[in-house]
Each structure stands twice: as C-alpha cells, then as structure tokens.
Regions:
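Conserved nucleotide-sugar phosphate-binding/catalytic loop shared by glycosyltransferases and other
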Residues: 9, 27-86
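Donor-nucleotide binding loops and adjacent catalytic segments primarily
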Residues: 193-269
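A short, glycine/small-residue-rich beta-strand->loop->alpha-helix junction that serves as a flexible
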Residues: 7-19
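Conserved nucleotide-sugar donor-binding subdomain of glycosyltransferases
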Residues: 72-108, 115-116
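Active-site-proximal region of nucleotide-activated glycan assembly enzymes
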Residues: 124-189
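C-terminal amphipathic helix plus adjacent low-complexity
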Residues: 327-384
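Nucleotide-sugar donor-binding patch of glycosyltransferase catalytic domains
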Residues: 247-248, 291-335
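A donor-sugar binding/catalytic signature common to diverse glycosyltransferases
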Residues: 109-112, 265-304
Length: 384
C-alpha cells in the first residue's frame, strides 16, 4: 500500500501515534508517500517528529484550542471566536489537503484526528479509503461513559469527533482496554499506538518525578509546590516555543523543551508521572508501570482522566498537587493486563487497516461491475 498521513499537530499524542504506525507499516512492506500536519501559530511542531518521520512533510493551518488568560485550561468560547475568523485560511487548507491527496498517488488515507481532513474527505471523492485513528473515537462508542459534568462541551466534543471522520471507511478507537467493536458506527477498538522504543526501553524506579504540561501556565503551580518541597527532584517537559532546551530553576527543578528521546529516558527512570491528561503519554507511563496524576485542561482530557481513573492507571486532580501523586503511588500496582493488551497492538491495528483497504476496494470493484452490467443491459434494450 501507498499511504498518506494527515495528522493533527496539537500536542504530542497524534504525532507519536503517526511515528508508531509508520514503523508498523514500513515493517509490513508498505510505503508512506506523504505526511501532512495541521499547525497553528500557538504551537510549534516538535523537531523530533520532523526528524523521525523521514518522509516528505508539509504543514497547513488548522483549528486549535486557545488557552485561558493564565495559559492553563482551554477557553471554548475564545477558541470558537478565534477559529471563526480564520475560516478563509481553513478553506485554503482544505484545498491544500485535496491537492496533496490527489497528487500523492496514495492507495489509502490515514487520518490522525485532523478535522480538516475529515471535511475534505466528505467533500471530495478521491476513490481511496480513509481510516481514522485516535482515542477520541471511543467517545462515540455506546459503552464509553462520558464524565457528565459538562453537557455542552461533551456534546460539542462528540460533534467535532464525528466531523473528523465523515464518510470514513473505518474508525480505529485507541483504548486502554477492549470495549468490543461497534460495527453499527464503524468503530474498531484497538490497543494504543505506542512506538517500539517505549516497549524496549529499560525501565527502573528512580527517585524523581517527571511531568508533561501542554500549557505552560501550569509551570507556576509546579514552582509553588516545589518551593514547599525543595528536596523532591522534578523534571517537567513543555512545548513553550521561546523556552531554552533546558531551564534549570535550581538543583531539584528543571524544565525541558519537549524532546522525545529525553522524555522517554526520564519516563523510564522516574518514580511517578504527572501530566495534563494527554492519552498517549499516560499509556506510555502505564506500559512502563509508572503511577500517574492527571490534570485535565479541557473536556477531552476530562474524559481521558476519568477513563484512567476507572482503570486504576492514575489519579485526577485540578492542579499540579504532587502530594496526591505521592499518596497514589504508594498503593499503585502495575497493570499486567494492559501490557498484554498492548502487545497485540501491531497485529490488531494492521489487521484493521488491511480489512478497511480490502473491503473498500472489493466494494468499489462490485459497484463498477454492477454499473458496467447495467450499462450493457441498457445498451441492449436500445439496440433491440
């Protein structure tokens, strides 16, 4: 297969999923012909992704959430108003995606939760299948229970998720556990997409806590806790664009610009992990046997945090209160079942993509055959 990736560039998760699937596809003898990544002026695509994807990569403007004034949580109304002003730019992006798909010669589109790709695929008939991948498709599964605390944002999240997969051939819902497939909605539940490096990195339990924050405003919370507990070693990662590669506040607190190799190294050796409830890094911590604390920044992360708590993978809280993480870590037990589930990820995900590919082209051939048969019948009628 010749494959084109379209990836949402917000945060780290979808980018690392694309890297993981790239490894699987190449191992199976397939080819990634092009990678398109949605970007915004508020986020910089990490260098580790641009270096490791090793494929012609182009960026396009895409909708994103704007943080609140304190740069912690996301502001829904502000984000909607901001993105509405950029509609002309997004229309240009849709045309850009259309042109690149048509010129790529790809046999299949893999969409990593990019909304403009969902719209593009619904508007134009490319004659190739689209498989959508993301943990967010679990929100459309009838067995998944939403938090229920924010009815309107939860409704809008589901609407947004449906737009990302309009007319999609298949939706792969990445999940911590097996909810079972939902054929009526075209949802296939599969293990998370973790890179091989996550599974092969030697892990041990050190004496420091590692963290990742999507919004840099949480740095003040970390500093405030650190002032009260200066003897606890902290290493926090962020994607603050104007920050140095390493900002050492003092001997026991360091902020690192997101660097994937360094992040996995620190994760493998930490005592526990604190994060703004992104799905991917929580799964990495879960696989490595690290207790987690999750601080949701928006409704999607509220869903992630609730799911993690249900699976006893972590504890949710409103702020970077690392005392809560320490208490949770004392009674934490590694989830062996998750590791077994995750070890089947490559087989299950590849089988789902192959199935979508074959079903699409088998159906297309049948439709073409039926159309030809119909045309012959009509021609025979007029000739008689």
């Amino acid at each position: 297969m010749k494959v084109i990736f379209v990836v949402q560039g917000e945060g780290r998760g979808h980018l690392t999923q694309a890297l993981a699937l790239r490894q699987i596809l190449l191992h199976e003898g397939h080819e990634i012909v092009k990678v398109l990544v949605g970007k915004s002026k508020n986020r910089k695509i990490p260098e580790f992704f641009l270096h490791q994807i090793d494929c012609p990569t182009e960026l396009f403007d895409s909708p994103n959430f704007l943080p609140s004034k304190d740069n912690k949580r996301f502001c829904l109304l502000r984000s909607m108003a901001y993105n509405s002003l950029l509609v002309p730019s997004y229309i240009s992006s849709i045309n850009f995606i259309r042109k690149n798909i048509q010129e790529s010669g790809a046999d299949i589109i893999i969409n990593f939760y990019e909304v403009l790709c969902g719209i593009t695929y619904s508007l134009f008939h490319f004659g190739i299948p689209e498989v959508c991948i993301g943990h967010q498709y679990l929100f459309l599964h009838p067995s998944f229970q939403m938090p229920g605390k924010y009815p309107l944002p939860e409704f809008l999240l589901r609407v947004f998720t449906r737009i990302t997969c309009l007319r999609a051939t298949k939706k792969l819902a990445l999940s911590i556990r097996d909810y079972g497939d939902n054929a009526a909605n075209g949802i296939k539940v599969v293990p998370p997409l973790l890179r091989q490096k996550v599974k092969t990195t030697i892990r041990h339990h050190g004496n420091y806590i590692v963290g990742y924050m999507l919004n840099a405003g949480y740095a003040e919370d970390v500093k405030a806790w650190h002032q009260k507990h200066p003897h606890t070693q902290l290493h926090f990662f962020w994607d603050k664009a104007d920050a140095p590669e390493e900002l050492q506040v003092d001997e026991t607190l360091t902020f690192h610009r997101i660097n994937d190799v360094k992040f996995l190294k620190y994760m493998a050796g930490c005592k526990a992990y604190a994060t703004t409830a992104g799905f991917e890094s929580v799964c990495e911590a879960l696989y490595m046997g690290k207790p987690c604390m999750l601080i949701p920044a928006h409704v999607e992360q509220e869903c992630n945090a609730l799911d993690a708590e249900r699976e006893m993978a972590g504890v949710a809280t409103d702020a970077f209160d690392i005392d809560k993480l320490k208490v949770f870590a004392r009674g934490y037990e590694e989830d062996v079942e998750f590791r077994m589930w995750e070890n089947y990820a490559e087989i299950r995900i590849m089988a789902a993509i192959d199935s979508a590919y074959n079903e699409y082209y088998d159906t297309t051939e049948t439709c073409v055959y039926d159309e030809k048969k119909s045309n012959i019948t009509i021609a025979s009628f007029f000739q008689s």
